[in-house]
Amino acid sequence: MSTLMVQGTTSDAGKSTLVTALCRWLWRQGVSVVPFKPQNMALNSAVTADGGEIGRAQAVQAQAANLAPHTDMNPVLLKPNSDTGSQVIIHGRAVTSMNAVAYHDYKAIAMQAVLASHERLKSAYQVVMVEGAGSPAEINLRAGDIANMGFAEAVDCPVLLIADINRGGVFAHLVGTLELLSPSEQARVKGFIINRFRGDLALLQPGLDWLEARTGKPVIGVLPYVLDLHLEAEDGIDQRQVGKVEQLLKVVVPVLPRISNHTDFDPLRLHPQVDLQFIGPGQAIPAADLIILPGSKSVRGDLAYLRSNGWDRAVARHLRYGGKVLGICGGLQMLGEQVHDPLGLEGAAGSSPGLGLLAFETVLEEEKQLRNVSGRLSLENAAVSGYEIHAGVTRGPALELAAVQLDDGRSDGACSADGQILGTYLHGLFETPAACSALLRWAGLEAVQEVDYHALRERDIERLADLVEHHLDTAALRRLCGL
């Protein structure tokens, strides 16, 4: 049983993607492999089979390893709820919120959870494929580190260092990162991977030769830049769109400061008949067929932000002209009359008026609802599956006209009597082809092409494994995996 860790010279160097690729590459060879990220900071999360939540990148990596997501795959998840603080989730459950200084002192406790999860995974699988966080060379974060070299040293595992050449300065990134590590950590780095290369590899070869001579460490391979790879983004919103046909449905999503689970919109971004626009601060909401209010980690704060940009008036105007509005999770709560936070779970305790578009109120409670669900939309009785991650309890007469009837007997969300407004707690509802098509028809698209988002993701995972096979030193990788 062995552990191999991927660390990056920067954020977005390609760590998540490489771990996904390696998981599928090993799984195709019959190796039992499991993804693992000691500590993740993200507002995009997934619900696990054991009823907790982990970063969505680890859920995608689990799919690559043909496993159901489990809380041991990401034992520490930090979900920012302010500029200086985060909700701390240990083994899938929210335990507290704290600022960065307090969390620094809490790391020793978090590390116990990390090591316990790693030990369980190591005893159950041939290979634990680990993803680091950010860069291991952040000097101010090295004391008490549990996400990068602190973890690697604790479990005595080899490390691969990946860097993004498309950003420029790849040799400075690799050599500089190595120089800032301690001697024992430097020895732990067993090779380099260069990511997102465009052009003739022969022109890069002198640089690779220099790097190996300078560091004494091998280049395991150079991965090409792939333009049309569409796995879920963990942090920043991916705004790339595929080629579109002429008949387009215009969908607008206002980007809120604490937007969460923006991966909800990936199926729309990839749909050939949807023109998806993310609207930022100071921008007016343009004419559209559908406005979607997204999930939020700070609903009252994001409501205030929405109003400060005049987007509440834009939503009202949109409805007057016959447009459709969809609220997802926090967006559902915003559609109601009041949002109450008596415990101060998302900031200062208090209440805020909602948009007043549906007759209900929401009270934020400490116990978070975490579950994978399936059921039927009120629209066309279309099959839908998704997941709930919310701390609010919503009550009011508008809920009598439910948006979803769940298979467990509960109803979810609400619809307006005129059919223009729909709200639901379900994340991921556009991933189910039938539900996505029904929602697009409701929003005004007539001849809807059905798109299977899960099949698209599976295709891209397979392509990643092919890249490992064709561009990396697979013999070296197998040795590092103890195979």
Swiss-Prot record:
Pathway listed: Cofactor biosynthesis; adenosylcobalamin biosynthesis
Any Gene Ontology biological process: cobalamin biosynthetic process
Superkingdom classification of source: Bacteria
CDD domains, per database record: CobQ_N, GATase1_CobQ
Active-site annotation: 329, 427
GO molecular function, one term: catalytic activity
Xref: InterPro entries: Class_I_gatase-like, CobQ/CobB/MinD/ParA_Nub-bd_dom, CobQ_GATase1, CobQ_N, CobQ_synth, GATase_3, P-loop_NTPase
S-S bridge residues: none
GATase cobBQ-type domain boundaries: 248-435
UniProt keyword terms in alphabetical order: Cobalamin biosynthesis, Glutamine amidotransferase
Family, similarity comment: Belongs to the CobB/CobQ family. CobQ subfamily.
Role: Catalyzes amidations at positions B, D, E, and G on adenosylcobyrinic A,C-diamide. NH(2) groups are provided by glutamine, and one molecule of ATP is hydrogenolyzed for each amidation.
Listed name of the protein: Cobyric acid synthase
Protein species of origin: Pseudomonas fluorescens (strain ATCC BAA-477 / NRRL B-23932 / Pf-5)
Gene that encodes the chain: cobQ
